[in-house]
């Protein structure tokens, strides 16, 4: 199979086009310009707002003008992650895609099908006048991945739809009718620099090979967190030897499970062989723990040039204890929807910043607002007890399921008619923009669906090609069956 043969042709054509347009979160200027130019080229009413959101309207097919207006919605930004051995500048370089069996993936980077496939689907609908539909508005939002900025900034009256179809879900055959709310927290330690004693052995300890993945949608899989695993080894080493912590770094994004982490430490020269033995023992234990969930986990130890400075011992101890105690993973399962994670937390990243600051970023999610606040307070308490300062982002609301939704009934009937099986009705343990849309447009009737994606937010991200055709056929059938306005 070659890329030119992929079906539906229009969707894959536009997906390949937007893969040529850099679109990191908070740096979406190029894709915004691309969308506005697209709307103007096709002589469609196009507008933007101050946040960067773009709305393109397409009139109804003749004879369908009295149907309810449908908003098709996707976010334009993508998570920018790459493997360490890959040279790629997400601000300038296109995403290079390749076919692997029935899957489309990128070469060593995130693919950006989250949510580029939704954007491409909307463009294919806007460009094709043979498709039957009532009035359609295509909403493209910015910065979903790092702050839901576009959804937060959306003003009342910017769009006028009665129904919203969010195209940002990742399992074909599933219709989502609810999502978790979330909040981000930042803990900061201030440290003093101290001298590393002369003659100490300096080395880099690294954790790599983990799958990573989405901190909401994949949190129930029991995947390894590089920050937690590295900290386990550092904690035992700190207790056993006269260890100086010179550098620590792990994870990148608040909404991704940390795949890689490393630390540079210094210990007495006489202990270096024992340290290597310790790491071999620890690595064997950890690899056994994650043999099923994360079988490619690796630990490495490499000699480093001597470091003159390190983090003071008191701060190092408090940091390592806090990272050990900080919760990560599933905290509670839903009592209403079997198999749905209700509340979770992600120990996302550990970074050294200018001004002798160590910053730890975490994110908490829950479909229950009070539980979201509870888990966030738990995280705050752990870090404050260790002497860190803690701050929170604004957070965002969840989307409470409405099992009696009219558009849900239409979509479910359509799926059964087309494919002979029932679609699965679900809620998702991840933040969708839908909860914020309801704040501004409380009468919106919404569902979320999409083709099958795996490994999103990691370089392993891939899209199951046959599900794109099913998603497309389903979407077009839904548009045909939108009811008349009341």
Model-derived segments and spans:
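Acidic, glycine-rich active-site loops and adjacent beta-strand->loop/helix elements
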Residues: 76-78, 139-147, 169-172, 211, ...
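Active-site-adjacent substrate-binding region
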Residues: 232-248, 393, 401-444
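Active-site metal-coordination/substrate-binding segment of hydrolases
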Residues: 64-146, 151-162, 202, 313-316, ...
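His/Asp/Glu-rich mid-to-C-terminal helical/loop segments that flank catalytic regions of hydrolases
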Residues: 157, 223-240, 269-272, 317-324, ...
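Zn-dependent metallopeptidase/amidohydrolase metal-coordination segment
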Residues: 7-11, 342-355, 363, 418-478
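Midchain, well-structured core segments that form catalytic/ion-binding scaffolds
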Residues: 102-105, 145, 152-365
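Acidic/His- and Gly-rich active-site-bordering loop/insert found
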Residues: 2-103
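A short beta-alpha structural unit
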Residues: 16-20, 264, 298-309, 348, ...
């Amino acid at each position: 199979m070659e890329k030119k043969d992929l079906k539906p042709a229009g969707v894959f054509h536009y997906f390949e086009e937007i893969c040529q347009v850099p679109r990191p979160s908070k740096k979406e200027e190029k894709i915004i310009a691309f969308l506005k130019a697209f709307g103007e080229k096709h002589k469609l009413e196009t507008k933007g707002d101050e946040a960067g959101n773009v709305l393109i309207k397409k009139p109804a097919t003749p004879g369908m003008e009295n149907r309810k207006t449908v908003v098709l919605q996707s976010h334009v930004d993508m998570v920018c992650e790459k493997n360490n051995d890959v040279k790629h500048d997400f601000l300038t370089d296109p995403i290079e895609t390749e076919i692997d069996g029935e899957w489309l993936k990128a070469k060593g980077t995130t693919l950006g099908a989250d949510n580029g496939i939704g954007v491409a689907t909307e463009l294919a609908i806007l460009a094709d006048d043979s498709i039957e539909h009532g009035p359609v508005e295509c909403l493209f939002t910015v910065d979903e991945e790092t702050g839901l900025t576009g959804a937060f900034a959306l003003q009342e009256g910017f769009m006028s739809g009665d129904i919203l179809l969010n195209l940002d879900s990742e399992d074909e055959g599933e219709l989502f009718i609810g999502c978790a709310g979330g909040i981000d927290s930042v803990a900061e330690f201030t440290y003093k620099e101290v001298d590393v004693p002369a003659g100490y052995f300096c080395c880099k300890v690294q954790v790599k090979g983990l799958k990573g993945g989405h901190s909401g949608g994949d949190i129930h899989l029991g995947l390894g967190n590089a920050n937690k695993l590295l900290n386990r080894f550092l904690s035992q080493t700190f207790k056993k030897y006269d260890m100086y912590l010179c550098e620590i770094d792990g994870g990148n994004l608040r909404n991704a499970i940390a795949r890689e982490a490393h630390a540079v430490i210094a210990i007495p020269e006489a202990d270096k062989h024992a340290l290597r033995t310790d790491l071999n023992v620890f690595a064997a234990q950890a690899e056994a723990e994650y043999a099923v969930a994360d079988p490619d986990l690796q630990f490495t130890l490499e000699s480093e040039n001597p470091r003159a400075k390190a983090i003071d011992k008191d701060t190092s101890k408090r940091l390592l204890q806090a990272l050990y105690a900080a919760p990560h993973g599933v905290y509670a399962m839903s009592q209403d929807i079997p198999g749905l994670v209700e509340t979770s937390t992600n120990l996302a990243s550990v970074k050294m910043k200018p001004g002798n600051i160590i910053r730890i970023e975490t994110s908490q999610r829950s479909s229950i607002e009070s539980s979201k606040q509870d888990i966030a307070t738990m995280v705050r308490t752990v870090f404050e007890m260790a002497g860190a300062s803690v701050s929170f982002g604004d957070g965002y609301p969840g989307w409470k399921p409405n099992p009696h939704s009219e558009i849900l009934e239409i979509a479910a009937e359509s799926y059964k008619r087309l494919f002979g099986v029932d679609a699965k009705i679900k809620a998702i343990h991840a933040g969708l923009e839908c909860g914020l849309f309801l704040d501004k447009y409380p009468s919106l009737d919404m569902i979320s669906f999409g083709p099958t994606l795996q490994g999103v937010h990691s370089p392993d991200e891939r899209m199951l090609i046959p599900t794109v055709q099913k998603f497309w056929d389903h979407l077009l059938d839904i548009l045909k069956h939108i009811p008349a306005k009341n």
